[in-house]
């Protein structure tokens, strides 16, 4: 029952030590998938979000504590409330039914020496306080059960005895709590996550109704943000506050006579983890993946998907995270003497500034930074808040006094009397400028004239140059001879500080701290305490201010005495010298990149196998740092299903000797699939089960090869040739660990990378598409193969020589003799020799070789042949080919003209191309010259504008410095991104890291583009391999030289890494018989063609034979067919050589307008009109230079070597000439008919008669004999 209680004030109370309780070691239970919380307050809907933060790892062991009382004489009474470490954060869950868990204590010492945080529910209010508490050894709250009125009430608050110096306090609105001790199962699950980040104590919570006897429930429920407390204290330990039950009140015996209501709470520790969170349309987290849990979870995070299709995937590194942090500074105990500098009685004048070297000491810069007395504290190249984390070789402190309005000149890139003539900082200055008003010290009534500055100097000072000379300054041309006078001035001027001057004219003391970066051993470090050195584990490290994440191992590198860090070829820090032991350590990444996960698809099974690329199985545990992995990951570093392949070590797939069609290509001839396996060679199975198996890629059933035992008849005049052909059908599958490539182990960079959206996802999606295409290529190539062929080593056996490949037989070709008639014209580009060749040739084609010309020492012929020339050379080549096997060299001699004319024509093409190339080079040189002139003009213009800018704005040097800094490429900055973060503020560091990310993203995009191009090339090769698999392996190709060299017999495929090897067995002719051939036989006006092969003649008779071997057969209707007539149609192909395109040079006016149009000057601050330099501007030289450039541009004319045009006439074909003759005959016949019909003979005085003229006699010509005639083409 409920009772109304008054607020129980939290005042100091008497502490009591509890007795008679049982001390037992804590138990452990599984956290399952509990502990996920909303990482930020951003609303997300229907999206997957990857985040890096402190999370409770899934399925981790959480510590189990009890509050319980088992009745009986020897009953157990447990009241567990030990002090526990806080670490990086805590997951706290309680299962209860009687409101036993009441709150927590957070702090360091948990006593009055330091502040602590108290969060407690006193049954009426929730109270939160930050004070210097003196907590009790056994803090608890008491609940009293009043037997008379059967009611429960809060009776004791024994948590602390004193509370002082409270800085934070919160008391909630009053409420009522049910204090009754209940029986039965636990009814409430309350979960909390505690984090202490940047001075804020963050609490997340969730309440879930349950009905459990013990342990945590399975299931998923995200904790929501409860409160952020700005407490600003350090927390290293915490303790849980419980309530106990009493049945009576005995003031003198408060340590005994108590019972414990049943409750349990569970404590787990947060670790740096990457989680993939799934938000529904309402913005609720409905599911999550712990990316470091196991290989499948890592694959999901890599793909950013909760479902994974069947295949093999490269993973990112989520599995190894740093376990601890180490700090290694030199063993230095002396404090740096900054007080001697800042508290000096008198400071130096600015022209004679003083310098003190500080070394071999500990520097606590926070004392300076937090001081309220400094009006200026600006740092360059380093953040003042990060100074205590850094080390330097030396620190130099420069001190002097200047006027208040001159402090701004003590900065990089400034100008003015102080910066130019007294104290100059370099543009790349790394250090801090500290200034404060010293009017009460350095001013006096009437003026303090002891502080001087240099007013005149012939030239500006160099950085950190000190000039204390007092030589008279000569302003004119007359020598001063050391005497002041007209145009002769004393160079120093006094300030004359007075207390009544305005702030801008009051004295300011300035101290400039210059930090010498680590080019030698560190001697000045912040006040951090060094920790023990940890090797061979993933850690966060800090060596003399160099921070990062990695594994430290012993190194065999040699350092020079001054060397502190080592860098590899990529400018990455890969080694460091320990500042205490001086040992050299290698720094390697925590991750092992070559890890691929094979999965049958999450819709099929959650089983996976893991391939560690290019690693021996014995080295896997060391390579992946197995001792730092989760238990579910660790099982994939060793085990029974370990299979060493050429691609690496495969773990998790059962290796079988059977062969199957390739389901998931792994590489190096190994495949995997998910199927029922009942005959495992590794262990006997009584029941068939599903598993991932690995096997060697197979092409089908096994058979022997017939030709290996000479079972195939081979003609005696042929020889066997075996040609090896390798075609790639896939390439190495790649996946980019985008986050690791860009950010390494930097968490800040990874968080910033998330702002780039899905770039990394899209990049890997493209690479995954390439990988899927490779699998598709492989499957398409091998899917058609039904039989496997095992070929023996290719040697000489059976009397056949398999090492030689003879030349290919040529195809005879002839032209019609009727074609030798009139002309067609073709135009060629003439480099200077074709016209002379034409004059020599005349109309005699046979003089082709005789008329070869000389051009630049080469014998050349035009790259054009008429049909007559083709017929001549072809006849000679044919004759040489036919006789080559019988005439012992005579046939080869007949082939010489053909080879010579081809060589000469190639020379002709070559020299023509050379002329074209020279012209293109002229164009390029002249264009480059023109561009150079433009650049000169722009430089001149920039120079002129620069003079204007110097006159208007004296801060131009700062702009130049900025341009210089921005122009450095992203590789020039330290590759350790944490080094940037250690030196710069967050905003500045994010700008620098953003620039690095952009540069590396561009590199990745270029890489993916190259991969896509390669994938397209591989796809084309795979298509060719598939065609050859179909035509060469499964059939016999009729295409010469397509399946090997020569005439195809058979082909045998073999799998190869990323491709297929074809062994093409072909036969090539060893001897050739002389024969005459014709493409067709004309008989009775009809053309007879062979069904297969060609017609050949043995000198007396015609036969039909196959084209690839000589087997004459009598010509019959079975081996011939009739089609068409004997007319031959000849086609002429015009051969035109095009001149190279010569684009007109664009006008440079528009290009120049972009630079000269709308050019505005920067805004000028006229606040101090006296600061403007009113010197005269003289840019006449620049104008003259521009005029000269314009003249040079006009002279950028291109004089090309002229290509002549040569016109050659080609003879018309015979049918044109026949048509022409037929037309002439028709005209003559018509004329004769007209003469006869009009008595034409009477006009000739009887010389002829019309009768004879018009008489038509019978045809007395002899009949044409019927027979067979041959027609050649």
From Swiss-Prot:
Protein name stated in the entry: Spike glycoprotein
Residue ranges of the region described as Heptad repeat 2: 1163-1202
Region (Receptor-binding motif): 437-508
Annotated region described as Fusion peptide 1, given as residue ranges: 816-837
Listed result of changing residue 346 to K: In strain: Mu/B.1.621
Residue span of region Integrin-binding motif: 403-405
UniProt gene name: S
Effect of residue 1101 to Y: In strain: Theta/P.3
Motif annotated as Binding to host plasma membrane localising/FERM domain proteins, chain positions: 1261-1267
Effect upon mutating residue 498 to R: In strain: Omicron/BA.1, Omicron/BA.2, Omicron/BA.2.12.1, Omicron/BA.2.75, Omicron/BA.4, Omicron/BA.5, Omicron/BQ.1.1, Omicron/XBB.1.5, Omicron/EG.5.1
């Amino acid at each position: 029952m409920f009772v109304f209680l008054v607020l129980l004030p939290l005042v100091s109370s008497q502490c009591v030590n509890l007795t008679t309780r049982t001390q037992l070691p804590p138990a452990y239970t599984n956290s399952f998938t509990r502990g996920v919380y909303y990482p930020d307050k951003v609303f997300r809907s229907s999206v997957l979000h990857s985040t890096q933060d402190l999370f409770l790892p899934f399925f981790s062991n959480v510590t189990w504590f009890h509050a319980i009382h088992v009745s009986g004489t020897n009953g157990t009474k447990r009241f567990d409330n030990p002090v526990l470490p806080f670490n990086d954060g805590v997951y706290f869950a309680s299962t209860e039914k009687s409101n036993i868990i009441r709150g927590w204590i957070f702090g360091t010492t948990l006593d009055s020496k330091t502040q602590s945080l108290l969060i407690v529910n006193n049954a009426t209010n929730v109270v939160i306080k930050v004070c210097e508490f003196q907590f009790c050894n056994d803090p608890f709250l008491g609940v009293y059960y009043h037997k008379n009125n059967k009611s429960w009430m809060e009776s004791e608050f024994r948590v602390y005895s004193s509370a002082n110096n409270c800085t934070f306090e919160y008391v909630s609105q009053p409420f009522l709590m049910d204090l009754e001790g209940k029986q039965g199962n636990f009814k409430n699950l309350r979960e909390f996550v505690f984090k202490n980040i940047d001075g804020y104590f963050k609490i997340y919570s969730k309440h879930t109704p349950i009905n459990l006897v013990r342990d945590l429930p399975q299931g998923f429920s995200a904790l929501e943000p409860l409160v952020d407390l700005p407490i600003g204290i350090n927390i290293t330990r915490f303790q849980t506050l419980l309530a106990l039950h009493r049945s009576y009140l005995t003031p003198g015996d408060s340590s005994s006579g108590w019972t414990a209501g049943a409750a349990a709470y569970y404590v787990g520790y947060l670790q740096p983890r990457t989680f993939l969170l799934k938000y529904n349309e309402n913005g609720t987290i409905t599911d999550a993946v712990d990316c470091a849990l196991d290989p499948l979870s890592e694959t999901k995070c890599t793909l950013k998907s909760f479902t994974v299709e069947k295949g093999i995937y490269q993973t990112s590194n989520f599995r190894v995270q740093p376990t601890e942090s180490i700090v290694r500074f030199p063993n230095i105990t002396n404090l740096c003497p900054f007080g001697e500098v800042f508290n000096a009685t008198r400071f130096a004048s600015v022209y004679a500034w003083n310098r003190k070297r500080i070394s071999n000491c500990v520097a606590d810069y926070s004392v300076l930074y937090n001081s309220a007395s400094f009006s200026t504290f600006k740092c360059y190249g380093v953040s003042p808040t990060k100074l205590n984390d850094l080390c330097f070789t030396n620190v130099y402190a420069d001190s002097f006094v200047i006027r208040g309005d001159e402090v701004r000149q003590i900065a990089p890139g400034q100008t003015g009397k102080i910066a130019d003539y007294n104290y100059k900082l370099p543009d790349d200055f790394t250090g801090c400028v500290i200034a404060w008003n010293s009017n009460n010290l350095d001013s006096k009534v009437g003026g303090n004239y002891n502080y001087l500055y240099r007013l005149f100097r012939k030239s500006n000072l160099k950085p950190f140059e000190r000039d204390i000379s007092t030589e008279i300054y000569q302003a004119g041309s007359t020598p001063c001879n050391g005497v002041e006078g007209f145009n002769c001035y004393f160079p120093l001027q006094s300030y004359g500080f007075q207390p009544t001057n305005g702030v801008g004219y009051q004295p300011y003391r300035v101290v400039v701290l210059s930090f010498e970066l680590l080019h030698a051993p560190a001697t000045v470090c912040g006040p951090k305490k060094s920790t023990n050195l940890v090797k061979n584990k993933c850690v966060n490290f800090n060596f003399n201010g160099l921070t990062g994440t990695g594994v430290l191992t012993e190194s065999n590198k040699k350092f020079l005495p001054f060397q502190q860090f080592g860098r590899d070829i990529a400018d990455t820090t890969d080694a460091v010298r320990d500042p205490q032991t001086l040992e050299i350590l290698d720094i390697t990444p925590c991750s092992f990149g070559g890890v691929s996960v094979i999965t049958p698809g999450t819709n099929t099974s959650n089983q996976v196998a893991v391939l560690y690329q290019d690693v021996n199985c014995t080295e896997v545990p060391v390579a992946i740092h197995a001792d730092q992995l989760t238990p579910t990951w660790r099982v994939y570093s060793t085990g029974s299903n370990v299979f060493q392949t050429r691609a690496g070590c495969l773990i998790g797939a059962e290796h079988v000797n059977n062969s199957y069609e390739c389901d998931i290509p792994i590489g190096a001839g190994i495949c995997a699939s998910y199927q029922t396996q009942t005959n495992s060679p590794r262990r006997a199975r009584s029941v068939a089960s599903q598993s991932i198996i690995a096997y060697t890629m197979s092409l089908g059933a096994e058979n022997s090869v017939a030709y290996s035992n000479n079972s195939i008849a081979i003609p005696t005049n042929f020889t066997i040739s075996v040609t090896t052909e390798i075609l790639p059908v896939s390439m190495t599958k790649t996946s980019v660990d985008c986050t690791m490539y860009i950010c390494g182990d930097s968490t800040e960079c990874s968080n910033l990378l998330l702002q780039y959206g899905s770039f990394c996802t899209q990049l890997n999606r493209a690479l995954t598409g390439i990988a899927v295409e490779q699998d598709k290529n492989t499957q398409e190539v091998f899917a058609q193969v039904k039989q496997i062929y095992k070929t023996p080593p290719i040697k000489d056996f059976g009397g056949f020589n398999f090492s030689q490949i003879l030349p290919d037989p040529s195809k005879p070709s002839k032209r019609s003799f009727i074609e030798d008639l009139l002309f067609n014209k073709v135009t060629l580009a003439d480099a200077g020799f074709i016209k002379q060749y034409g004059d020599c040739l005349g109309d005699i084609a046979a003089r082709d070789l005789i008329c070869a010309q000389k051009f630049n020492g080469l014998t050349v012929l035009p790259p054009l042949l008429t049909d007559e020339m083709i017929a001549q050379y072809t006849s000679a080549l044919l004759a040489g080919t036919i006789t080559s096997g019988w005439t012992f060299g005579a046939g080869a001699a007949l082939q010489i003209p053909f080879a010579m004319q081809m060589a000469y024509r190639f020379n002709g093409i070559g020299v023509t191309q050379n002329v074209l190339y020279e012209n293109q080079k002229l164009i390029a040189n002249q264009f480059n010259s023109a561009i150079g002139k433009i650049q000169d003009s722009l430089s001149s213009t920039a120079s002129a504008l620069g003079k204007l800018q110097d006159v208007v704005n004296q801060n131009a040097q700062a702009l130049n410095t900025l341009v210089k800094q921005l122009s450095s490429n992203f590789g020039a900055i330290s590759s350790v991104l944490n080094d940037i973060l250690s030196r710069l503020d967050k905003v500045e560091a994010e700008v620098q890291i953003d620039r690095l990310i952009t540069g590396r993203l561009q590199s990745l995009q270029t890489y993916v583009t190259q991969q896509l191009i390669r994938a397209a090339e591989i796809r084309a090769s795979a298509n060719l391999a598939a065609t050859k698999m179909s035509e060469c392996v499964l059939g016999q190709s009729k295409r010469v030289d397509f399946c090997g060299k020569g005439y195809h017999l058979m082909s045998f495929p073999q799998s190869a890494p990323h491709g297929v090897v074809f062994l093409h067995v072909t036969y090539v002719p060893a001897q050739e018989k002389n024969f005459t051939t014709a493409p067709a036989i004309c008989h009775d006006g009809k053309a007879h063609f062979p069904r297969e092969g060609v017609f050949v003649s043995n000198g007396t008779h015609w036969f039909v034979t196959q084209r690839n071997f000589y087997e004459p057969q009598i010509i019959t209707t079975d081996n011939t067919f009739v089609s068409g007539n004997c007319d031959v149609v000849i086609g002429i192909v015009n051969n035109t050589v095009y001149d190279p395109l010569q684009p007109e040079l664009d006008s440079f006016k528009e290009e120049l307008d972009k630079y000269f149009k709308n050019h505005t000057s920067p805004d000028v601050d006229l606040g101090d009109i006296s600061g403007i330099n009113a010197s005269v501007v003289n840019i006449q030289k620049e104008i003259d230079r521009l005029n000269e450039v314009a003249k040079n541009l006009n002279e950028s004319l291109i004089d090309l070597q002229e290509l002549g045009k040569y016109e050659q006439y080609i003879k018309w074909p015979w049918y044109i000439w026949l048509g022409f003759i037929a037309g002439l005959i028709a005209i003559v016949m018509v004329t004769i008919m007209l003469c006869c019909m009009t008595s034409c003979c009477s006009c000739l005085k009887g010389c002829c008669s019309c009768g004879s003229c018009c008489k038509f006699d019978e045809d007395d010509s002899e009949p044409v004999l019927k027979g067979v005639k041959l027609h050649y083409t």
